Amino acid sequence: MVLIVRILEKNGKKLVNKCYPAFSVSNRKRKFAPFPTLYWLACPETDAMVSNLERQGLIGDLELKINSGQYELERQRFRQQHFRYIHERNRLLYDLSLQHQLDINIEDNCVSWLHNAQRLKGIGGIDVAPLIDANSDEMHLKCLHAHYAHYLGTQDNIIGEWVHELLMRKK
């Protein structure tokens, strides 16, 4: 079971769910597993449009764009966005008042395990270890849905912003 922390809407239409960074794997025992995706597209139409962009090869196109050398400022922003995302996820994970509000009790060893399992996973589950080196050669992308949901939820995701611009042009 995924725990919804907040629902983001526009014009009465559910756009994005903000999720707790762990999900229950058992109803009988308080067992939790990492759920690294904080922002989840909740609108079926938007989800379908982003799926269509992925089928058309946009992930590869955007990887080429961000790695082309022409977008160094965007590249630096993207690196920073991953680390802000990890920080936000960790803050939620350790927020005891939120755990109380959601009526869950995550034991310390479970929090530690979840933190270690997710500490180097950025937006869309991307391994950020190579991003620690500011001169790393190549950035990779996964799941435009995660990037776009993160953009809609925070306005802080360059890949999601590019996806948004493409979707607005297609309307």
Residue ranges of predicted features:
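Preference for intrinsically disordered or flexible, low-complexity segments
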Residues: 1-171
